[in-house]
Amino acid sequence: MKDLFILSGPTAVGKTEISLNLAKALRGEVISSDSMQIYKHMDIGSAKIFEEERQGIPHHLIDVVEPWENFSVAEYKNIAENKIEEIYNRDNIPMLVGGTGLYINSIIYNYSFTDANKDNDYRDYLEKLAKEKGKEYIHSLLKDIDEYSYNNLHYNNLKRVIRALEVYKVTGKPMSQYAKEEKENLFNIPYSIYYFVLYMDRDKLYDKINMRVDRMLQEGLLDEVKELKEMGCNETMQSMQGIGYKELLYYLNGEISFNEAVYLIKKGSRNYAKRQLTWFRRDPRAIWINKDEFENDDAIVKEILNKFNKLKGF
């Protein structure tokens, strides 16, 4: 299997510079795994790496869609997998770099984003039948086809009951068997994974986050949000849900003060970092790198390369 390198970690931990040095050493090409860097015109708030800062390292999945367009995980997976193959064809190593865990997982887990196991018409029929005959009747339909779900799902949990019936109709398998097979195939991917997660002392990280927000504001984040608003972007759009954008939009709309917006951006960023770390801990393949244990980024790069080579048996 071909190598797939991942460098992740919470927001503001310092992934970018390390990723560039790793890419030079590995002949790597970076595929952004950041759900905000996907959007054009959203540069400062997403901490986007500009062309002149990339040191000749190819970067992909940055500036893909307009801020008023939606972009799904399934779309990310499709584009990223195509980029991975293109990078292999150039005899380089693809490197997923970013902090959006769902984007990373779409590549390193055998997730299906197709509708192959769905039947909307049948689901609609069951929902209508539930209104006519009651939840208990719908639940009773499970008894002969999926005894496990029948015994473990309460009839009030209508959504799960209907899902179990739908899975059986489409796949011919009880939900429990289908879920078991899905779980067994979860790690069945065509890559050898080298997954590194950067972290540091929480208080230090939170200080870095606060300073980063201040720096973004100094660099013109408010003007960036003003320009997006002038383009027609509003709070209903997926892109404008990003931390830093939604709060400043509230400010520009007169809903909160500027100081309140800054406070909420910092608080939201810290909470996001906490959620990211929780997410990364779920993957047993992740190798954790404590930045506090190293003198500088060069030492961190050296440590990651040593671990990478050991895993490859060099």
Curated annotation (Swiss-Prot):
Keywords: ATP-binding, Magnesium, Nucleotide-binding, Transferase, tRNA processing. GO terms for molecular function: ATP binding; tRNA dimethylallyltransferase activity. Catalyzes the transfer of a dimethylallyl group onto the adenine at position 37 in tRNAs that read codons beginning with uridine, leading to the formation of N6-(dimethylallyl)adenosine (i(6)A). It comes from the Bacteria. Residues 34-37 are annotated as: Interaction with substrate tRNA. Substrate binds at residues 11-16. It catalyses: adenosine(37) in tRNA + dimethylallyl diphosphate = N(6)-dimethylallyladenosine(37) in tRNA + diphosphate. Signal peptide: none annotated. The gene is miaA. ATP binds at residues 9-16. Belongs to the IPP transferase family. NCBIfam families: miaA. One of its GO terms (biological process) is tRNA modification. This is tRNA dimethylallyltransferase. The record marks 100, 123 as: Interaction with substrate tRNA. Pfam families: IPPT (PF01715). Its EC number is 2.5.1.75. Gene3D superfamilies: 1.10.20.140, P-loop containing nucleotide triphosphate hydrolases. SUPFAM superfamilies: P-loop containing nucleoside triphosphate hydrolases (SSF52540). Its cofactor is Mg(2+).
